[in-house]
From Swiss-Prot:
This is Probable replicative DNA helicase. Keywords: ATP-binding, Autocatalytic cleavage, Chloroplast, DNA replication, DNA-binding, Helicase, Hydrolase, Isomerase, Nucleotide-binding, Plastid, Primosome, Protein splicing, Repeat. Its EC number is 5.6.2.3, 3.1.-.-. It comes from Porphyra purpurea. The lineage of its organism: Eukaryota, Rhodophyta, Bangiophyceae, Bangiales, Bangiaceae. It is found in: Plastid, Chloroplast. It holds the Pfam family DnaB_C. This protein undergoes a protein self splicing that involves a post-translational excision of the intervening region (intein) followed by peptide ligation. It catalyses: Couples ATP hydrolysis with the unwinding of duplex DNA at the replication fork by translocating in the 5'-3' direction. This creates two antiparallel DNA single strands (ssDNA). The leading ssDNA polymer is the template for DNA polymerase III holoenzyme which synthesizes a continuous strand; ATP + H2O = ADP + phosphate + H(+). One of its GO terms (biological process) is DNA replication, synthesis of primer. A replicative DNA helicase, it participates in initiation and elongation during chromosome replication. Travels ahead of the DNA replisome, separating dsDNA into templates for DNA synthesis. A processive ATP-dependent 5'-3' DNA helicase it has DNA-dependent ATPase activity. Residues 156-424, 308-568 form the SF4 helicase domain.
Amino acid sequence: MLTQESEDLLKQIEKLSPDFFYFKSNSLVYRAILETVNPIDKIALVSLLTALNTNNLIRQLGRLETIMKLIENSPASNIIYEYSKVILDNYVKRLLLKSGDSLCLISCSKKQITQSVITSVASQLTIAYEILEDEGTYTLAEIFASLLVSLDTKKKISINSGIFSGFWQLDLITNGFQKSDLIIIAGRPSMGKTAFAINITRHIIKTSQYYVILFSLEMSTEQLLRRILAQECHLNSQKIQSGQLTNVEWQRIVEESKILANLNFYIDDSAEISCDIIKVKVKLLRLQGKKIKLIIIDYLQLLQESKKSENRSQELSLITRSLKILARELNLPILVLSQLNRNLESRHNKRPLLSDLRESGCISKFSHIMWSHVSKPLFNFSIKKSHMHNFNKNIYQLLDQGEAFISRQDKKTTYKIRTNSEKYLELTSNHKILTLRGWQRCDQLLCNDMITTQIGFELSRKKKYLLNCIPFSLCNFETLANINISNFQNVFDFAANPIPNFIANNIIVHNSIEQDADLVIMLYRESYYNKEMEMEDMTEIIVAKHRNGPLGTFQLKFDANLANFLNV
């Protein structure tokens, strides 16, 4: 069958692996077929026999007659789909049997069962699940056909594929939370991040049939339920906790509890959890028929990384990347709450910037920063609103825009990177550099990486502290020559706004974890810092990043007693 000419045959070959075959002889023949398959013509029998003979596989299979017998008894190619389905089905069954054996061994073992052991077994089940999913590589014709059908359906019934938050101004900007998007809700403590997420959750589970799961790494399930009941019953959560309730209030709680109990909402309050465990738990729920449509994680900084890194900053970078990959794999939005860098507390203007969403990456105090066509070292830098050079990746140009905020940090180990043209920069391991491979941390740079630099400015030994340069608009790429440990020294944290990157020693640097996010929403309440404000209950919602749409700012009313946000 596999040596007959068929377009369907070539499509099915992409879905099958040699490991799917039970008999070794079939696996060896199929592996040889994969090596000789021609996407234009049918699989040539002569080429197949030559490949088997070259790899000394004919002897392993027994004799040439065995192969000829397989060919003679092969059915027509028009039923290739049914045969491939049988092969896949039997392979999945063997995987399930293997998982069952593993469970039996674990159950009979005297060793303590750990979460990692359970995760390992669950991973075997998810592999079986993924094999049955119809995923692959598609042509543009197939993609456009699917897209046009989807758009036509939306046009006819006037629906949006996004998941709406219930805050009309936010939904107007975002058009709903989209599938495969990583959404970060950020703010300093006491801004109401968890309350905001609960508001969104309540709206979704009450107005749709969507399943939502919330991974709470900070609050227990009981604490979260008290908050939800407080919002639903319009009662202070502290009053619910104390139990000092009137008969009317108690009856209200009972009625709302009955309604909430029937909604499609799951809470997981595991203290330590990683992206891998989240993936397994969501896929197991899907296997049970629970079509999870939204994942909420409270909050980012408490997530664990399966592969331990040298420092927490590197772990967070890996976690956000893993979350984005998970959102794409599960084809759903993931909403993650995140703390902002505490350095903004030292600024006069406490309104958060996109660059505050990071673990601090620092650079040497001797680094020269480009500012209004002038370069100054950090230790001689005076902050003022002026033009600072940023890199705009959309037009691939260096522009004069933005302002900066600097804070002095403790001593840290720095590394010196140097290009072939002798450009250099001293920075901590978690600071990011723009390369042809995208933004890369210092500890992830490779020799011969192409580093993005600016054109038109060179450090001058004669003008050490103040260097004039000509205006520039283009950037250049230079080869990374070496990276060495430099010194244990005082460093500075440098934040840029509105684009979270800047130019130091001619090299474009960046230290934000927001690069993996599709949507970044920041919460800010001026009255938290200014107690004399009249509108003390107003919270500013800042859409600071929107990969697929506009930015925007609007206000919501915050009820501190109920920890509840309201449209205005």
